[in-house]
């Protein structure tokens, strides 16, 4: 069967534009030519692809199947032409990517200005959220995702690993005490993510490991959200304990607003990946952005261990007691100021 690729591309454009007239205007062709090309395509395939009415067009079942495959072909042709052009002029064009809100705000957004300074011809469209856009269907060029990849058609490049730990503000510890073992968590005020819920019994658990074994400990959250960033205000105000990524908590630890609790226990470690559709040409703009992130992201988990209460206790034993007591007094005062400001 002979095949005219132009007929296929015209069909994709008609579906994209929603009418023959709009497609003709977009392509710079007469409407009669566009209509004839689609008819010739239907004749060659032996199937009607479009429902035609005076006001609109719609896809038949055969048309929907054909369009799904042809849309990918059209997009890959466009990307191939763009890639060849960028070999001459450098990466350029819109780069659409998605990233979870907490990581996007804390780690990705502060780097975008630097990236644009290096690649001024790349325009960035960042989608913050936990919903997964369709990379295969072209809703985004790239996704920055945490955790395992559910779709075998996606490939990933690892940007780093995220370790989760339990954090509390000085004001919380002053008011409610500090848990010394995860068994005590069920008696403490906690802030949890929806993913911590057990779907079978509708109870919440935190998975924690002491290095030799992983156990699930029940918690009774007073607040639940789908992103840890939504719980930051509550943990800073001393309302509860939060199990979150060390890199998300790092700015607050550095400023003394929170500290790690339950020394020796850590939550799950998950990968942070740059994800894109497999089997597709990786455009120079995507490659440039991923290479930049690999170079600039620094998930320094060792820093968090330096803030571990057990390590601070060891420092006191080695003669740093007066300095540490003074620091903790300042942290308690800061915690009170945060709480008073939030409840004023």
Swiss-Prot record:
Coiled coil: none annotated. It comes from the Bacteria. The keyword Cell membrane does not apply. Disruption phenotype: Disruption of the gene alters the expression of about forty genes associated with diverse functions, including extracellular enzyme production, attachment, biofilm formation and flagellar biosynthesis. The mutant shows reduced virulence, but the effect is less pronounced than that of XC_3703 mutation. Activity is regulated by cyclic di-GMP. Cyclic di-GMP specifically binds to XC_3703, which inhibits the interaction of the XC_2801-XC_3703 complex with DNA and prevents the transcription of the target genes. The keyword Transcription regulation applies. Keywords: DNA-binding, Transcription, Transcription regulation, Virulence. One of its GO terms (molecular function) is sequence-specific DNA binding. Pfam families: HTH_1, LysR_substrate. One of its GO terms (biological process) is DNA-templated transcription. Residues 20-39 bind DNA. Gene3D superfamilies: 3.40.190.290, Winged helix-like DNA-binding domain superfamily/Winged helix DNA-binding domain. Residues 3-60 form the HTH lysR-type domain. Transcriptional regulator that directly or indirectly regulates the expression of virulence-related genes, including flhB, aaeA, fliL and flgG. Binds to the promoter of the target genes only in the presence of XC_3703. Interacts with the cyclic di-GMP effector XC_3703. Belongs to the LysR transcriptional regulatory family. This is HTH-type transcriptional regulator XC_2801. It comes from Xanthomonas campestris pv. campestris (strain 8004). The lineage of its organism: Bacteria, Pseudomonadati, Pseudomonadota, Gammaproteobacteria, Lysobacterales.
């Amino acid at each position: 069967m002979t095949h005219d690729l132009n007929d296929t591309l015209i069909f994709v454009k008609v579906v994209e534009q929603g009418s023959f007239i709009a497609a003709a205007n977009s392509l710079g062709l007469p409407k009669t030519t566009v209509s004839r090309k689609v008819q010739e395509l239907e004749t060659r395939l032996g199937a009607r692809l479009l429902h035609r009415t005076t006001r609109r067009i719609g896809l038949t079942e055969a048309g929907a199947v054909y369009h799904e495959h042809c849309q990918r072909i059209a997009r890959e042709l466009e990307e191939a032409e763009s890639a060849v052009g960028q070999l001459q002029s450098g990466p350029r064009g819109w780069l659409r990517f998605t990233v979870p809100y907490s990581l996007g705000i804390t780690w990705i957004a502060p780097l975008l200005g630097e990236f644009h300074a290096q690649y001024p011809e790349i325009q960035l469209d960042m989608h913050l959220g936990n919903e997964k856009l369709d990379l295969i269907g072209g809703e985004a060029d790239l996704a920055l995702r945490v955790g395992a990849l559910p779709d075998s058609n996606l490939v990933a490049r690892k940007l780093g690993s995220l370790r989760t730990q339990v954090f509390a503000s000085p004001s919380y510890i002053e008011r409610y005490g500090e848990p010394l073992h995860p068994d005590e968590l069920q008696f403490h005020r906690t802030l949890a993510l929806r993913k911590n819920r057990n779907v079978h019994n509708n109870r919440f658990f935190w998975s924690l490991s002491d290095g030799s074994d992983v156990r699930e400990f029940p918690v009774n959250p007073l607040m639940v959200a789908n992103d840890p960033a939504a719980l930051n205000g509550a943990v800073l105000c001393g309302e509860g304990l939060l199990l979150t990524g060390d890199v998300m908590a790092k700015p607050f630890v550095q400023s003394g607003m929170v500290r790690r609790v339950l020394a020796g226990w850590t939550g799950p470690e998950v990968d942070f990946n740059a994800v894109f559709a497999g089997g597709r040409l990786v455009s120079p703009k995507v490659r440039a952005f991923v290479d930049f992130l690999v170079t600039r992201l620094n998930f320094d988990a060792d820093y968090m261990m330096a803030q571990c209460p057990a390590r601070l206790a060891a420092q006191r034993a080695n003669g740093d007691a007066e300095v540490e007591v003074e620091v903790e007094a300042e942290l308690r005062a800061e915690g009170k100021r945060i709480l008073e400001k939030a409840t004023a």
